[in-house]
From Swiss-Prot:
Higher taxonomy: Eukaryota, Viridiplantae, Streptophyta, Embryophyta, Tracheophyta
Stated role: Might contribute to the loading of the ESCRT machinery.
Organism per entry: Arabidopsis thaliana
PROSITE patterns per record: GAT, VHS
Name under which the protein is recorded: TOM1-like protein 3
Keywords: Membrane, Phosphoprotein, Protein transport, Transport
Amino acid sequence: MANNAAACAERATNDMLIGPDWAINIELCDIINMEPSQAKEAVKVLKKRLGSKNSKVQILALYALETLSKNCGESVYQLIVDRDILPDMVKIVKKKPDLTVREKILSLLDTWQEAFGGSGGRFPQYYNAYNELRSAGIEFPPRTESSVPFFTPPQTQPIVAQATASDEDAAIQASLQSDDASALSMEEIQSAQGSVDVLTDMLGALDPSHPEGLKEELIVDLVEQCRTYQRRVMALVNTTSDEELMCQGLALNDNLQRVLQHHDDKAKGNSVPATAPTPIPLVSINHDDDDDESDDDFLQLAHRSKRESARGTGQGNFNPILPPPPSSMRPVHVDSGAMDFLSGDVYKPQETFENVKPPSTSQSSNHDYSAPIFDEPVPQSKSPEHALFTKPVYDQTEQLPPAPWETQEPRKYPPSMSARTNKRPEYFQHNVPQHSSSASESSYDDLLGQSRNLSLNPTASAAPVTPPKKDDKPEDILFKDLMDFAKTRTSSSSSSKPNNQNNKPF
């Protein structure tokens, strides 16, 4: 218990606080009132914190001293004088400290010297500090008529057992009269927003079935800070002319009201619903009857969809966007037969079908050949192996494409071998005279020259030969030439034998 006041003074001047924590300050006053012996340690800690270089710690120490002087009586006044706190305050003002710290010290000295009766009062040390600064040319802030007296008048009526919320607000407001509400800066607004966020997280983490968690020291301190900031924000909004500062203050006020309402609901045991952002529906301003029309359209679409679904149960499902494909009138099937493209012959199996139609051929102007297309499918009654090993039958009924020599102009061919050989015996029979042995050499030269002319110019000595007929095959023509050549050779050999016998000498 010996260090409770000192520890409480340390917490009241903690640099992590964004402002004076009135709950801790009141707790410090209660400890000193219950045990006045602890006031010495508390004042010692406050003096040390007042000499800090951090202006925030200095202002927190001044608020704690003000609270003790208003609530703890003459013991604290004497300790402030004995610990030489008043000379320290005068030195701080002369060093030109932070404006908020300076204004707070001047306000406290003026209030204290007036409350203690000036130079002839009970504690002239307060007046001496005030007079020293005044003689140094330092101006003190003007006093307001609505300021609350430093000392509370003696009680004349009994204390009401149950205090109302308005009385509590009035008491807190009285303790804040020395503070300038319009001095709330942008940094303090941001610090207050941080306290709101911390309190919101802590309230959300509490178990709804155990409201005792609201009595935790940190939560109580944050709630008191939020209430204090709420009053300062309202004063700021009513007095400031800065639009940006006013907007920030209004936003902070909304957040403060929300978190305090959340705390009050939890304290009363009411279930707090989880706040979730609800989507705002888009509303057309120009049309008033859009909702009714949309409902009617929806009902019409629903009825029409039901009718279509009932009608579609007896019919096949089809895609209304794409029309059904047309039925194929001429299916193309692969023929199992084979075709010789060199000769144009078509080979088919021996088995014939009744429903097979001959392929239709079309002859274009350039006589191009097109593959046949069957009008009806060819039934495959046999297996592929049977179709491969069956004996092909030459189809003579089908019309074949014209031969190349029929589509082209007739050419002039040289005389065949048979024509040449046929001319030779005639020549020997008609042109070779019966000469004697003396004229054999000259006749042989003439015969050789004429045969040479005959072989070099066949068209002059032989009649033009017609091209082979279509029905004659090359093998037949070659065979005929060989036969003619053999006959010619036989006849020439038989005619030369008598001539040789006649040429023999007697």
